[in-house]
Amino acid sequence: ICACLVGSEMCIRDSSDTEQYVYGLEAGRILRKIHSIPAPATQEDWEIRFNRKMDYKIKKYVECPIKYENGQAFIDYINENRHLLKNRPQVYQHGDYHIGNMMIGRGGQLHVIDFNRNDYGDPWEEFNRIVWCAQKAPLFASGMVNGYFDDNVPMEFWRLLALYISSNTLSSVYWAIPFGQDEVNTMLNQAKEVLSWYDNMRNPVPTWYFKGYYLQYIDGIPFKLKSTFDFSFMKEYGTVFKVYDDQDSGNICFGTEKDGQRYFVKFAGAPTEQYGGDPADAISRLKATLPIYSDLKHENLIELIEAKEIGDGFAMVFKWADGDCMGRMYPAAYRRFIQIPINDRLAVFSDILSFLECVVSRNYVAIDFYDGSIMYDFVNGKTTICDIDLFRKQPCVNDMGHMWGSSRFQSPEEHQLGADIDEITNVYTLGATAFALFGEYNRTREKWQLSDKLFEIVTRAVSDDRANRQQTIRQFTAEWEAAQ
């Protein structure tokens, strides 16, 4: 069973950066195999054939009543670079090779479909549809180019691709007219975007292009790093089935399975791609979180099993918690989450209230607590809180100016150097979380899905004036429960 790469739960935009890039690499390698089939010897010379095609498109564009803003840049680039067509090879072409004609199998394999427009021509001309890929997923598009050329992309390719895209874009506007204004507007916007990528056709390398990640594999799972690192020690925790490599904290995380049990391993010490600091500092920070997880044990907090120095770094091992993160940075999971019944979301919020009451009762304050810290098991209806690494003991003062966390969940004092960060701050956090759960992050009455009374309570909680908020988590909880 396959799912289309766009427009499904396994949509490319819902994949991690690494997954998008790796799928692109595979798409490029598949295309290279397709292009291994030569064209018949009787095929018309490519230079003659494509020049005729471009002349026709220029003529139709000039006659078209609708013009692109600075569309002349496409024509000028074509006329200045026709010589690039000389002596180009010809091969079998898929004919419509782009992200919409690919599918992902249940096992994660990439498949190419819809060969009904197959043709013969310059293999590099086949990339002209990459415009659609780059608009939806630049990392996928970059991977496709890098995979095709084994990370050694010649400049001549970029110059020719710009020629082919110029030709293709010219024809799009007059092609769209019979389909109505919406289709015309789509092509006008696309042309504007293409011109921005190429600096009005002055730079043949588009701005969306990314030279790629350093990829490493563990148990067949790809992940990105700055440079190679020995993860052989991970065998101690079983087989890796998932890698989380997008953190900017210096940590990299793994889902593992051993003897029928699953674990979540958080490791510091590797040269992670998103982290700009010293791995030694990441190790120190991760070690400092150990007492936090020990002090704040709660039925909804992810369960810490062990922590130790290993593999020239430091690892914390947790019991695996099934579920999806409710954060908007995970679009597929978020869409599922906002569709669950209100009563289930109320139960999630009740779990969050209980956990934050536990936090303040043990003389801590929640910092960097946001939707990305909340997981929900859709099968068993269980809430799990994770990633509390930056919680602090009271008293706490803002010593950063702009503290760690998502601005959608942060109180004004979390942006004010020297301000107290305390239980009243976490009342604001609760209010912001309620708006995320029951208002789709919007703080207007129109979007609010519960009663007027509950809306008033939550609006007080997110007041910029600390004195107007509920002064304790317990006060907020009492008001919330009384109003339900």
Task: List where the protein language model places each region.
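Single conserved hydrophobic/aromatic residue that forms the stacking wall/gate
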Residues: 1-7, 12
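Helix-rich C-terminal or lid/interface subdomains of diverse kinases
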Residues: 21, 25, 86, 129, ...
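Active-site Asp-x-Gly
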Residues: 90-92, 105-158, 388-413, 420-427
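Catalytic-loop of the protein kinase fold
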Residues: 92-94, 99, 356, 360-377
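Juxta-kinase regulatory segment immediately upstream of eukaryotic protein kinase catalytic domains
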Residues: 208-241
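ATP-binding glycine-rich loop module of kinase domains
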Residues: 241-243, 249-291
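Short beta-strand micro-motifs within the conserved protein kinase catalytic domain, predominantly
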Residues: 303-314
